[in-house]
Each structure stands twice: as structure tokens, then as C-alpha cells.
Amino acid sequence: ASVVLAVLSTPVEHPKIPEWEMILSSGAVCMNLLSCAQSLGYASQWLTEWYAYNDKMLEYLGARKNLDKISGFIYIGHKIEEPTERRRPVPEKIISYL
């Protein structure tokens, strides 16, 4: 990847925004970065991997231990080749309605 972005969830105390919404918003950031990169013709991927949970990595990124979390690493670059399509589940077998 030509670029790797680290996305952190850094919740703060706020009278109107619950911590859970702050955490969810960092996931939305990751998803929007993927969408934007792909719309511009780049290949992109969102991974966490072991280093997202590593204290040294958190320290390196300036995160607050036990407060901030790495939501993921966004890899952006150019495709060398088209990825092969993986088998997908049949929606009717995994979705149920009430």
C-alpha cells in the first residue's frame, strides 16, 4: 500500500454525545475512507491485525492507554491485479424476517 492511515477512537466526556456513538463514529470514518478511496479508483482495505491492540503502537501514535482504541488501519494503493471474487452466502439462507 502506498498509504496507511491509522484511525483512532478517542472518546471524551461530553454532555450530549454518548461514548458509544463516538466509538461508532470512528468505524464510520474507516468505512467512508474506503468508499472515497475506491471511488477515486484506488484499492483499499480496512484491517486491525494484532498491532491495533499493541500498547507500543498506541504509545507510538500518541494514544491514551486504556482510553483510546485503534479502530483500524486503512491501506490505500493501486491494484496490481483484480482480486478474485470469493464465494458469498446465499442471502435467503442467512436472513430471516419477523
Each language-model region and where it sits:
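Glycine/small-residue-rich phosphate/adenosyl-binding loop
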Residues: 1-26
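Short low-complexity, flexible loop/linker segments enriched in glycine and/or proline
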Residues: 60-63
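Short hydrophobic alpha-helices that are characteristic scaffold elements of the AMP-binding
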Residues: 35-39
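C-terminal helix-cap and adjacent tail motif
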Residues: 66, 70-98
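GST superfamily/GST-like fold recognition
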Residues: 17, 21, 42-56
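Acidic, glycine-rich active-site loops and adjacent beta-strand->loop/helix elements
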Residues: 11-12, 50-54, 80
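A short mixed-secondary-structure module that forms the rim of ligand-binding clefts
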Residues: 27-33
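Short coil/turn connectors at secondary-structure junctions
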Residues: 1-3, 42, 66-70
